[in-house]
Amino acid sequence: LYKLVKVVLNM
């Protein structure tokens, strides 16, 4: 659930 958070922050 870390990569997902990074992707959302990248948005």
From Swiss-Prot:
Species this protein is from: Brevibacillus laterosporus
The protein's name in its UniProt record: Antimicrobial protein BL-A60
Upper classification of the organism: Bacteria, Bacillati, Bacillota, Bacilli, Bacillales
GO biological process, one term: defense response to Gram-positive bacterium
Keywords from the named record: Antibiotic, Antimicrobial, Fungicide
Top-level taxon in the UniProt lineage: Bacteria
PTM statement from Swiss-Prot or TrEMBL: Contains a choline moiety at the N-terminus and a tenuazonic acid moiety at the C-terminus.
The keyword ATP-binding belongs to this UniProt entry's keyword annotation: no
Activity versus pH, per record: Active between pH 3 and 11.
Function, as annotated: Has antibacterial activity against P.solanaceum (MIC=10 uM), X.vesicolor (MIC=100 uM) and B.subtilis (MIC=5 uM). Has antifungal activity against P.capsici (MIC=15 uM), B.cinerea (MIC=25 uM), V.dahliae (MIC=200 uM) and F.omysporum (MIC=50 uM). In P.capsici, inhibits mycelial growth (EC(50)=7.89 ug/ml), formation of sporangia (EC(50)=0.6 ug/ml) and cytospore germination (EC(50)=21.96 ug/ml).
Temperature note: Retains >80% activity after 15 minutes at 100 degrees Celsius.
